[in-house]
Regions:
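N-terminal low-complexity or simple alpha-helical regulatory segments
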Residues: 2-84
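Long, amphipathic alpha-helical coupling/dimerization segments that relay conformational signals between
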Residues: 65-163
Length: 163
């Protein structure tokens, strides 16, 4: 059973975790293009993940994660954030959670170790899916920018008749 204590602690400290991540992004040489992303927007996105973590891990379907993260990928395409930097920030987001879980876990207690392992496994699955969906959304938006969808043949015909 997923430890609600650890999830609750993450949710309770979501502001602090989001602030920590923002600081890491600013300091990272691997996320330079994030100057194109509003700090408020980034903090809101990260805070939402941390604050609603239990819901994301227990209640959300894969399609919910896909939809949410594909939109993030598309948005970062618009903001001209390279895919490598986008993925790096997702990795930083995950690592911030991992470090927090390590910091608040009581070492040596078998029950806590099992609960921690379960949480880390679920987090890993969540972030793997998030990385895939983000990349797919990013690639789709990038392809749309290079080759915008053409008007349908019917629309082109109607336009010619009017003009």
């Amino acid at each position: 059973m997923l430890t609600f204590k650890l999830v609750h602690l993450i949710q309770y400290h979501s502001d602090r975790l989001a602030d920590s991540l923002l600081c890491q992004v600013k300091m990272s040489g691997r996320a330079r293009s994030y100057c194109n992303v509003s700090p408020v927007e980034l903090k809101d996105r990260v805070h939402d993940i941390y604050h609603h973590l239990g819901s994301w891990l227990l209640d959300k379907r894969e399609s919910d994660i896909d939809q949410r993260y594909a939109a993030i990928g598309a948005r970062r395409t618009e903001q001209q954030v390279p895919l490598s930097e986008l993925i790096w920030v997702i990795v930083l987001t995950k690592n911030t959670l991992y470090k927090f879980v390590d910091d608040v876990s009581v070492p040596g207690q078998v029950a806590d170790i099992a609960e921690k392992q379960e949480l880390l496994q679920r987090l890993s699955q969540f972030f793997d899916e998030a990385i895939y969906a983000t990349t797919a959304g990013y690639e789709h938006a990038a392809a749309q920018r290079v080759h915008p969808p053409q008007a349908s043949a019917k629309t082109r015909t109607n336009t010619r008749q009017v003009g």
